[in-house]
């Protein structure tokens, strides 16, 4: 099973995310990664292999920030490679997400999105969700002239996920809303925690304890 963890607060998000991913190792996985808001961008670091290998990557090529998401992947679509590891990026980088579950209609959605000009860099079903959310966000901005607000981000996730067939749990970052994580689920577990000036999301309560 895949593992998801997310954090908004005042601590170094990378430290919390890595600790959370270690606590989710019991679920089984073949790769791991994190995405953190860092100097105005969403910085993604990911590796095929164990969380300890991701630890070493962060030690040498770390990112500092107080908002981020993390993931451990057990491959169901696509090989076990660095590029297929989560998090995945949608559109032109405006959406970054992690996903637990299976997108049963990913082939048809991939074809539709490729027709619209979206370029796929992985062989995963998850990248379909990232591009789909980005598409609805871009369409909303073009149609309404609306900037990327919290409300808009929530609504485009809702719109995109209605087109997904299968089970899912997702945690989504938006480049232009650096204080927001949108989480959604259907059939895959997610838990939410609220602390003093901190907010958490995870596949189970393990990363939230302590």
Tell where the protein language model's regions lie, with residue ranges.
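Conserved short alpha-helical segments that host acidic/polar catalytic motifs at enzyme active sites
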Residues: 1-210
């Amino acid at each position: 099973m895949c593992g998801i963890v997310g954090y908004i607060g005042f601590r170094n998000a990378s430290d919390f995310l890595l600790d959370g991913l270690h606590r989710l190792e019991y679920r089984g996985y073949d790769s791991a990664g994190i995405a953190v808001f860092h100097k105005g961008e969403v910085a993604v670091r990911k590796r095929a292999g164990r969380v300890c290998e991701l630890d070493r990557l962060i030690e040498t090529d770390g990112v500092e920030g107080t908002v981020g998401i993390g993931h451990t992947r057990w491959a169901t679509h696509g090989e076990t490679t660095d590029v297929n590891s989560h998090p995945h990026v949608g559109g032109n980088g405006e959406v970054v997400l992690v996903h637990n579950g299976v997108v049963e209609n990913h082939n048809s959605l991939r074809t539709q999105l490729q027709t619209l000009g979206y370029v796929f860099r992985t062989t995963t079903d998850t990248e379909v969700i990232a591009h789909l959310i980005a598409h609805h966000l871009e369409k909303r901005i073009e149609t309404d002239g609306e900037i990327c607000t919290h409300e808009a981000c929530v609504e485009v996730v809702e719109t995109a996920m209605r087109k997904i067939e299968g089970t899912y749990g997702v945690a989504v970052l938006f480049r232009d809303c650096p204080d927001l994580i949108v989480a959604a689920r259907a059939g895959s577990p997610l838990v939410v925690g609220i602390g003093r000036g901190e907010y958490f999301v995870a596949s189970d309560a393990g990363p939230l304890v302590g």
